[in-house]
Amino acid sequence: ISPTETAQSFYQKAFSLAADNLQLVLESYLSNPESLLPQDHSQKSYFPKLTKDTAKIDWSWNLNKIEAFIRALNPWPIAWTFVENLNHDIFKMKIFSAFINQNKSDLIPETVQIEGKNKTEWNEIKKYYSLIRKN
């Protein structure tokens, strides 16, 4: 898994790998079913159900966690936050991809979508909007 992997790209790789190896795994199981290990239920962990509400970015997190959160929620439900335009109107903005700048001091959105608008690049609209980085 690469550090820039999104949920969607991971699913595509995992499904392809599973499809390529399904026959081998089934043959191995059928020839030696006792070789399987039972699942250790004490090691289970839970992640809350994904909804559009749980996709809101928490700006109190560190930049690495926010960037990973954005990748994990692509293709659904897509991480989001609020932006303010020059007239001080506030809009919801989905962030499809982002990166941490060179000096590791800021998260830079890449592909975004302002509520009611088409998907675009942040560089094309950042002069009209500013991120609201509070919860």
What do the predicted segments below correspond to?
Residues F10, T54, Q113:
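Conserved short-loop catalytic and cofactor-binding motifs
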Residues L37-Q39, Y46-P48, P75-P77, T81:
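Proline-rich low-complexity regions
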